[in-house]
Curated annotation (Swiss-Prot):
It comes from Brevibacillus brevis (strain 47 / JCM 6285 / NBRC 100599). This is Large ribosomal subunit protein uL14. Keywords: Ribonucleoprotein, Ribosomal protein, RNA-binding, rRNA-binding. GO terms for biological process: translation. Coiled coil: none annotated.
Length: 122
């Protein structure tokens, strides 16, 4: 579960290293986001020379959460960190590489480009 003020690692090579959630998109008064949800973030740290700069406000999709998600077969999938991928307005990723595993739930939310770039889909 990601809420406002939550800090997330960045799972792509867009240039950002750490994000802070400032808004959860989708519905009025929505408090939390889970895997596959789009959030608005502020870039808290970035690598020099990257596409994304520190202080910039970007959209991102959550790809890993510590709280995890329940699958229809009753199993739970959890990760060691909260991570997101920076996206453009057309839902395509800003970076050209994805680092670490991503959850299969992204396929249901139509983030096929992220699924195809990811080294492992769990």
């Amino acid at each position: 579960m990601i809420q406002t003020q939550t800090r997330l690692a960045v799972a792509d090579n867009s240039g950002a290293k750490e994000l802070m959630c400032i808004k959860v998109l989708g519905g009025s008064g929505r408090k939390t986001a889970n895997i596959g949800d789009v959030i608005v973030c502020s870039v808290k740290s970035a690598t020099p020379g990257g596409v994304v700069k520190k202080g910039q406000v970007v959209k991102a999709v959550v790809v890993r959460t510590v709280s995890g998600v329940r699958r229809n077969d009753g199993s739970y999938i959890r990760f060691d960190e909260n991570a997101a991928v920076v996206i453009k307005d057309d839902q395509s990723p800003r970076g050209t590489r994805i680092f670490g595993p991503v959850a299969r739930e992204l396929r249901d939310k139509d983030f096929m480009k992220i699924i195809s770039l990811a080294p492992e889909v769990i």
